[in-house]
């Protein structure tokens, strides 16, 4: 288990999953990168983790399941899962875009992925947590208030 902000990649195509994982590992230094080509195993892994925070890179279609089903399955443990997700799709149709909007997913990338687009999306989500951590370190009263939640 990592002490950082981990990235969890889920794509039912093992080759694509491996490529995305290697790409993220080439630039990401704030945690570990875990990858799954089986969404059920990914759900089980997420629910067994101690920490309910991660960045998710999820294919919109996961065999017989949807990426949105995956997010709904882990939402109780990961309350910010939807907003901390990058959905990837071979075809970002109007339906996929509307599902992202309805699910509060702000990042949608089309395959083939452009490495810089993925890096910027991961960085944007990471920045939210880095800013929060800085605020906790700088403001003792704020940190105490958060600890009481």
Question: What is each model feature region?
Answer:
Residues 38, 66-69:
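Acidic catalytic/metal-coordinating carboxylates
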Residues 44, 68-81:
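Short amphipathic alpha-helix used as the core "switch/output" element in two-component signaling
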Residues 113-122:
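C-terminal output helix
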């Amino acid at each position: 288990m990592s002490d950082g902000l981990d990235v969890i990649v889920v794509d039912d195509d093992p080759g694509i999953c491996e490529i995305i994982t290697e790409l993220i590992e080439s630039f990401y230094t704030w945690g570990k990168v875990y990858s799954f080509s089986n969404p059920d195993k990914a759900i089980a892994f997420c629910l067994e983790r101690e920490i309910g925070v991660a960045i998710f890179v999820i294919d919109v279609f996961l065999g017989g399941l949807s990426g949105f089903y995956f997010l709904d399955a882990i939402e109780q443990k990961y309350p910010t899962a939807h907003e901390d997700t990058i959905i990837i799709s071979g075809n970002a149709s109007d339906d996929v875009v509307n599902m992202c909007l309805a699910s509060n997913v702000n990042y949608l990338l089309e395959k083939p992925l452009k490495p810089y687009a993925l890096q910027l999306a991961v960085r944007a989500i990471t920045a939210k947590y880095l800013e929060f951590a800085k605020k906790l370190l700088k403001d003792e009263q704020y940190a105490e208030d958060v600890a009481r939640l």
